[in-house]
Amino acid sequence: FLIENLFCEGEMNLTYSHIDRIIVGGVVPTTQPLALMAGKALGVDFFLERRELGAINIGGAGKVIIDGEVFEIGPREAIYIGMGAKSVEFTSDSVETPARFYINCAPAHHTYPTRKITQQQASPEKLGNAENCNVRTIYKFLHPSVLPTCQLSMGMTVLEPGSLWNTMP
């Protein structure tokens, strides 16, 4: 399905899918931190009370502050936040080149530790060929070969120069 206006500066935009109970979102903090808020729709006291979250930064440098602990998340880096984190805030290091956090959040049944994942730590998989203009690398940030999660997997595709398209991972 199509989610429009996912990355708007100074905003957190979340979409809940009833199909998998997944929440997809874009977070672009500028002058103020942007915090996850539970709301009545989730029926919990705090956003990650029964959920886990992954965030990949596709923008400038930023930070994720989890229960007071600061994680510096640079471009093309990710963070996994385990179930039970009570406070989560996103910030950017620069208003001119803000962080752009792509997030996925899924129900969880177990708590795994919060962890930052660099692009070097992600599991890369090269796919495609030049003849079909789809040479690309999928960096698996949240994947069983990288770290444990309840059910959340996340990656980022990087197209090589001259490549024009990607398939669904």
Regions found by a protein language model. Give the residues of each.
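Long alpha-helical, hydrophobic tracts
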Residues: 42-47, 69-71
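Surface-exposed beta-loop interaction hotspot
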Residues: 91-150, 154-156
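A structured, charge-rich N-terminal accessory region that forms the first stable segment of a protein
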Residues: 1-6, 10-13
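Short amphipathic beta-strand/extended segments with alternating polar/hydrophobic composition
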Residues: 35-37, 72-76, 115-117
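Short, conserved beta-strand element in jelly-roll/cupin
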Residues: 47-63, 156-161, 169
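Histidine-centered metal-chelating micro-motifs
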Residues: 78-79, 83-91, 165
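Short acidic-glycine-tyrosine-enriched beta hairpin
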Residues: 67-83
